[in-house]
């Protein structure tokens, strides 16, 4: 995230002018903007103007007898600057665009005060965000977004015969770089030659997509994952092509490839990749890896010593009241609640846990680990000491 200008006080009002430079930045912006904030940006809007002819309400016959000409309305798309009071935010991760709907609060000749408008925030387009309260969560989110060292850490080619998807695991988003699908014929008898030809073409398409989407100046590790031997076949093809065509990005980073077995080539198998020990070791100091480890620690504790782990808002709150939380795991979706009081409640809760010496991990709902946490209410904790009576409290 490029921060162009900032003018705010901690736990007070202010504004930040910024520009999203990649998909991760848009995701952070989505988590940063909430109800009662305002956003100013250049936008486009269709505006109408009357033509020379008059009243559109008259029919052709009425116009004939009344001696009046029919009117028509011309519309044109104009570029203007608007500021909207945020009511709704939508993030389209596939299109790399964020839509912010709200009422206009900026005087403009084309759009009246109070009229609804939807701003579209895209990559490389500056915008200004105003908040009445830059709380600790907002400041942490802004800091993470502008941390250049925390870009896409991991590239994953998730595949099976005839299907390959490329994912980039970054600060908190897994964005699909490409999806390649090919119908592979059966490998038997006279059809073997056709099978080999189609498979080679499929692999070549995956190579091209990999070269297009994976930048080793940013990515620390590239994983090729599949069931069976597809990953091995593709890895061999990739290295042979790199030698034949002198593909320097591949040749210079051969040691950064890891092969991982998964149960399928579909997105849900990403969690298998992230839990692989070799992958964890390569990205052990990144935010994503730390979150995966924290979640693994929670499940291990819940399995081996269930009195030292809990989940659900009520149980976690009671655990904190007793100063028992060692590690808090919470999903970012809880902070996007349309009710400002609910959002503030969770922000204050996180701050309170930190103040009492607890460690806090805020999971992205778009990460595989975040999806797992969401299945357990989106909030969980590892405890400093056992609380066996928690199970008697209704969740």
Swiss-Prot record:
Gene Ontology MF annotations: metal ion binding
Classification via SUPFAM superfamilies: Dom34/Pelota N-terminal domain-like, L30e-like, Translational machinery components
Superkingdom in the source lineage: Eukaryota
Pfam families: eRF1_1, eRF1_2, eRF1_3
Cofactor(s) required for function per UniProt: a divalent metal cation
Main location as per UniProt: cytoplasm
Membrane-spanning parts: none
SMART domains: eRF1_1 (SM01194)
One annotated GO biological process: RNA surveillance
Any one Gene Ontology cellular component term annotated for this protein: nucleus
UniProt key word Nucleus: yes
Location in the cell: Cytoplasm; Nucleus
Protein keywords: Cytoplasm, Metal-binding, Nucleus
Family stated for the protein in its record: Belongs to the eukaryotic release factor 1 family. Pelota subfamily.
Function (record text): Component of the Pelota-HBS1L complex, a complex that recognizes stalled ribosomes and triggers the No-Go Decay (NGD) pathway. In the Pelota-HBS1L complex, pelo recognizes ribosomes stalled at the 3' end of an mRNA and engages stalled ribosomes by destabilizing mRNA in the mRNA channel. Following ribosome-binding, the Pelota-HBS1L complex promotes the disassembly of stalled ribosomes, followed by degradation of damaged mRNAs as part of the NGD pathway.
Identification of the protein by name: Protein PELOTA 2
Organism annotation: Arabidopsis thaliana
């Amino acid at each position: 995230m490029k921060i162009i200008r900032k003018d705010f006080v901690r736990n007070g009002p202010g504004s930040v002018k910024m520009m999203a430079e990649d998909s991760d930045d848009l995701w952070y912006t989505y988590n940063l903007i909430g109800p009662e904030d305002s956003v100013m940006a250049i936008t486009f809007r269709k505006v109408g103007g009357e033509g020379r002819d008059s009243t559109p309400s008259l029919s052709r016959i009425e116009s004939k007898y009344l001696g009046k000409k029919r009117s028509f309305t011309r519309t044109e798309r104009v570029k203007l600057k608007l500021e909207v009071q945020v009511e709704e935010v939508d993030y389209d991760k596939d299109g790399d665009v964020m839509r912010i709907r709200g009422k206009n609060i900026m005087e403009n000749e084309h759009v009246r005060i109070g009229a609804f408008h939807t701003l579209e925030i895209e990559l490389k387009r500056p915008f200004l965000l105003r908040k009445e309260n830059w709380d600790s969560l907002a400041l942490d989110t802004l800091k993470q977004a502008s941390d250049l060292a925390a870009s896409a850490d991991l590239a994953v080619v998730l595949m099976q015969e005839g299907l390959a998807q490329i994912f980039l695991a970054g600060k908190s988003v897994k964005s699909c770089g490409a999806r390649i699908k090919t119908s592979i014929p059966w490998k038997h008898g006279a059809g073997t030659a056709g099978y080999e030809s189609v498979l080679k073409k499929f692999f070549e398409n995956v190579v091209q997509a990999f070269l297009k989407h994976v930048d080793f100046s940013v990515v620390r590790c590239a994983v090729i994952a599949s069931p069976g031997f597809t990953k091995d076949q593709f890895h061999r093809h990739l290295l042979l092509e790199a030698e034949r065509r002198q593909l320097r990005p591949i040749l210079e980073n051969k040691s950064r490839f890891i092969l991982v077995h998964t149960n399928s080539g579909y997105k849900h198998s990403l969690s298998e990749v992230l839990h692989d020990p070799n992958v964890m070791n390569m990205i052990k100091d990144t935010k994503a890896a730390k979150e995966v480890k924290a979640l693994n620690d929670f499940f291990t504790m819940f399995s081996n010593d269930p009195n030292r782990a809990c989940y659900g808002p009520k149980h976690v709150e009671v655990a904190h009241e007793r100063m028992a939380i060692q590690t808090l795991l919470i999903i970012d979706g809880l902070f996007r609640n349309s009710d400002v009081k609910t959002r503030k409640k969770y922000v204050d809760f996180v701050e309170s846990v930190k103040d009492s010496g607890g460690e806090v991990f805020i999971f992205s709902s778009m990460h595989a680990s975040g999806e797992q946490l969401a299945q357990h209410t989106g909030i969980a904790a590892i405890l400093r000491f056992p609380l066996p009576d928690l199970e008697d409290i209704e969740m």
